[in-house]
Structure formats: structure tokens, C-alpha cells
């Protein structure tokens, strides 16, 4: 196998106009591969550390020149000569160099950039697609796209508390048809909003961001859009939410729709919402440290709804193991930059799957044209991907990559569809 001959790092811009890290890895057989690192807006307290410069005179303190320098000065020389196929050894070497539990010395953005670029280079050198290189011969399942078509919370300048209102086209026969139906509902929603004189400006992830009287009003608008687009709600298309509850949790209470609520009251709200709407998945319904609340909600509705831990788990195997042991949540959101290396991400997915937890591959609100997570979704067979609305190049780049993968797989391709949500039963 080809060995690492050179590594180049640079500062580029993400979809929010903030700097992020891009890395190129060159091998001795002439292969060159590139990877860019995403960045979140609502971040969990237990995520690996994304290193920012803090120099207010440069990119308002958000520069990543230090992370780039760490790659050039502390990582490059240590990895020259490694076989690119030795992903686990390479990732472990970077963790050893860093020497911290949260990657605060080198920066998770530095480590991840190198980790992903190495994997891409190894795949290219082996003349394999990334999903086939990582997933082997059984990588054939196309994920359900969880399209965030109405944005609130930290992703939008609106009064809507819930961060993401998503549609999942579970009734489509193929990924291509799922993407088409999602795009048609997205455009229908814009028409519905305009007809009601509601704002059609976009949030960070390409979804519309109107001010609304209640969070349930968002679901009513999307339901109208689904019908307008000619689809059946609950059968063709279902709902999913990312509440990001940590964002409105303080001093033991949740400030939701203008009122202070307990974990029990929030759980009751979600139960009623699930009774009224075809919701298959709720992400981060409670705060990242409210373990007892998570246990109660999972026991209450976990048999019929996917309860997803994002800030709760931060793609960290140790926190996922605790969630499994304590029956808190029944699914894991997977974000490569939360844990900060490819092998740790794959370990997290493996741990979740072995425990019967579902996994949802996810982007971040600050994205680039990098399509790695599309390949990862197929490689891991997770059956679900969350990468924003079917709009804006940073979002559709992932959807378009999945179209290419489905086309390449041809008759071997399978679309996850309703099978991705075994707990959900349509009315």
C-alpha cells in the first residue's frame, strides 16, 4: 500500500463565512486527496475541542491558523512514511501526540482533517470509492434523507424554539425518488409561507425561518406543504425534530414557548405532539446532562419513537455506553467532528449498532463542499442522514453524492425507507 509522502493544511471558509480547516494528503504513488472539517452552532459541552485562534482582529477571533500550524509543525513529520491504509494506527498516533482527553492540544479540527484526508487518499490509491473502502462489499444501503426544511433555535433568527423541523420521505422506492419528493415539499412550503405572508428567508441549513406563534404551527405548515405537493403525510412522508433542548435549559428548567417547564412537562409535550403528528424521531428533546429526564422519556415513548442523543452523546463511545446502560435514548446522532477522528466515529457507530441503537449520520450547521458523510452513511449502513434542506450547495453536495452512489451501485442499491424507523407504525 502507498505511504504518506506529504500533508498540506490550509484555512478555508465554511458555509457561514467562518474559517475551517482543509487538509490534503499526498501518497508516494501520486495520489492526492482532500478533506474539509465542518463546524457546529449549537455544540455539546462534551464535544472534542475545536481549536480557534481567539484573535479578535482576525476573523473576529474564529480563525483556525493555530490548528493549521499544529498540523504542519506537530503532525506532518510524525506521519510521513505511514501506510495510508493504517487508519487506526495513524489516528492513534495523532491522539498520542495530542495527549488530552478532548483533543485540546492539537484541536479536533486539526486531527479530523488529517484523519479524513488519509482515508480518502487510501481509498483513491486502492481505486475504491470511499464508501466501499470503509464499508466493504456489504455497503449498499442508501439512507433516508432527514431534510431540515424549517429552521429555528440557534440556526435561525426567529422566535421558534425547536431547532429543526425535518421531513423524512420513507415511502419512496429509491433515494432518487426520496430526494425528489423532499425537494417538492420544500418548494411547496415556500409557496405556503408566501401565501400566508410569512418570511421565506433561510436559516443556516437552508430551511425557511419564519416567526410563528407556536412550535406546532411549524408542523401544521409543513403538513399543508406535504399535501400541496401531492404526498400522503404519515405514509409517504413523516416528521422528525431536533429540539436542541440544551439551548433553552438553565438552572434546572426549560424556557419553552415563553414559559418555564420541567423535564416531566417537556416529556408530556412531546408525547402529545407525537399523538397529533406522524413523528418518527426526536433529537435532543432534553438537556445534555438531564439523564433522568432522558430515561423517563425513553421509557414513555421509546417504543414508538426514535429518541436521538446528539449533545447527550457527542459521538463519544464512553457517553454512548452510559446511555445504553441507563436506557437513555435509543439512537445516536453521528457527527465526525464531535469526536474528532474517523476511527473513533466508526467505533461509536459499531457500539451503538451492537446495542440495538439506531444511528443517524449528520452534517453541522457550518458546512463545506466536502461529501465524506454521504459515503460514511452508506459505509456504516446506518439508514439515516441529516444534511439540511435540499438547497444551498453545502447541503446538496451530500445529497448529490448519494445520488452518484446509488447510480454506481445500480441493482445492488437498497433504499432504507420505512425500515430505518422500525419503531414507527403509520396510522
From Swiss-Prot:
Q: Which CDD domains match?
A: enolase
Question: Where on the tree of life does the source sit, at the highest rank?
Answer: Bacteria
| Catalytic activity entry | (2R)-2-phosphoglycerate = phosphoenolpyruvate + H2O
Q: Where does (2R)-2-phosphoglycerate bind?
A: 163, 335, 364-365, 386
> Which PROSITE patterns does the protein's record reference?
ENOLASE (PS00164)
Q: Where in the cell is it found?
A: Cytoplasm; Secreted; Cell surface
EC primary class: lyase
What does the record give as the active site?
Answer: 205 (proton donor), 335 (proton acceptor)
Q: What SMART domains does its record include?
A: Enolase_C, Enolase_N
Q: Name one GO cellular component term.
A: extracellular region
**Which pathway does it serve?**
Carbohydrate degradation; glycolysis; pyruvate from D-glyceraldehyde 3-phosphate: step 4/5
Where is it mainly found?
Answer: cytoplasm
Q: Has UniProt tagged this entry with the keyword Cell cycle?
A: no
| NCBIfam families registered for this protein in UniProt | eno (TIGR01060)
| Main function | Catalyzes the reversible conversion of 2-phosphoglycerate (2-PG) into phosphoenolpyruvate (PEP). It is essential for the degradation of carbohydrates via glycolysis.
Please state what the protein is called.
Enolase
Identify the species of origin: Salinispora arenicola (strain CNS-205)
Q: Which gene encodes it?
A: eno
Amino acid at each position: 500500500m502507498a505511504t504518506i509522502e506529504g500533508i498540506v493544511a490550509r484555512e478555508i471558509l465554511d458555509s457561514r463565512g467562518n474559517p475551517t480547516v482543509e487538509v490534503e494528503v499526498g501518497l508516494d504513488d501520486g495520489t492526492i486527496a482532500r478533506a474539509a472539517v465542518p463546524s457546529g452552532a449549537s455544540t455539546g459541552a462534551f464535544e472534542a475541542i475545536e481549536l480557534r485562534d481567539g484573535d479578535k482582529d482576525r476573523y473576529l477571533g474564529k480563525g483556525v491558523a493555530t490548528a493549521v500550524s499544529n498540523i504542519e509543525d506537530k503532525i506532518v513529520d510524525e506521519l510521513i512514511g505511514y501506510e495510508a491504509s493504517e487508519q487506526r494506527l495513524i489516528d492513534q498516533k495523532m491522539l498520542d501526540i495530542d495527549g488530552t482527553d478532548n483533543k485540546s492540544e492539537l484541536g479536533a479540527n486539526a486531527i479530523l482533517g488529517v484523519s479524513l484526508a488519509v482515508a480518502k487518499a487510501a481509498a483513491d490509491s486502492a481505486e475504491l470509492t470511499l464508501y466501499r473502502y470503509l464499508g466493504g462489499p456489504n455497503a449498499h444501503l442508501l439512507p433516508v434523507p432527514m431534510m431540515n426544511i424549517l429552521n429555528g433555535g440557534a440556526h435561525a433568527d426567529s422566535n421558534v424554539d425547536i431547532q429543526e423541523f425535518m421531513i423524512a420521505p420513507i415511502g419512496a422506492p429509491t433515494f432518487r425518488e426520496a430526494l425528489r419528493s423532499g425537494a417538492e415539499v420544500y418548494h411547496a412550503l415556500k409557496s405556503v409561507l408566501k401565501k400566508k405572508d410569512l418570511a421565506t428567508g433561510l436559516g443556516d441549513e437552508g430551511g425557511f425561518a419564519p416567526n410563528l406563534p407556536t412550535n406546532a404551527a411549524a408542523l401544521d405548515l409543513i403538513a399543508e406543504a406535504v399535501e400541496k405537493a401531492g404526498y400522503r403525510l404519515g405514509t409517504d412522508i413523516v416528521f422528525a425534530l431536533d429540539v436542541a433542548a440544551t439551548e433553552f435549559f438553565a438552572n434546572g428548567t426549560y424556557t419553552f414557548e415563553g414559559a418555564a417547564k420541567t423535564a416531566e412537562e417537556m416529556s408530556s409535550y412531546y408525547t402529545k405532539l407525537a399523538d397529533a403528528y406522524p413523528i418518527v424521531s426526536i433529537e435532543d428533546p432534553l438537556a445534555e446532562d438531564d439523564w433522568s429526564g432522558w430515561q423517563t422519556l425513553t421509557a414513555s415513548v421509546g417504543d414508538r419513537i426514535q429518541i436521538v442523543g446528539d449533545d447527550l452523546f457527542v459521538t463519544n463511545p464512553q457517553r454512548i455506553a452510559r446511555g445504553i446502560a441507563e436506557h437513555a435514548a435509543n439512537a445516536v446522532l453521528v457527527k465526525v467532528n464531535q469526536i474528532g477522528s474517523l476511527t473513533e466515529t466508526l467505533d461509536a457507530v459499531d457500539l451503538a449498532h451492537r446495542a440495538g441503537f439506531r444511528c443517524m449520520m449528520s452534517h453541522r450547521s457550518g458546512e463545506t463542499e466536502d461529501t465524506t458523510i454521504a459515503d460514511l452513511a452508506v459505509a456504516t449502513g446506518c439508514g439515516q442522514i441529516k444534511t439540511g434542506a435540499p438547497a444551498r450547495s453545502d447541503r446538496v453536495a451530500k445529497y448529490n453524492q448519494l445520488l452518484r452512489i446509488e447510480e454506481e451501485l445500480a441493482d445492488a442499491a437498497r433504499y432504507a425507507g420505512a425500515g430505518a424507523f422500525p419503531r414507527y407504525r403509520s396510522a
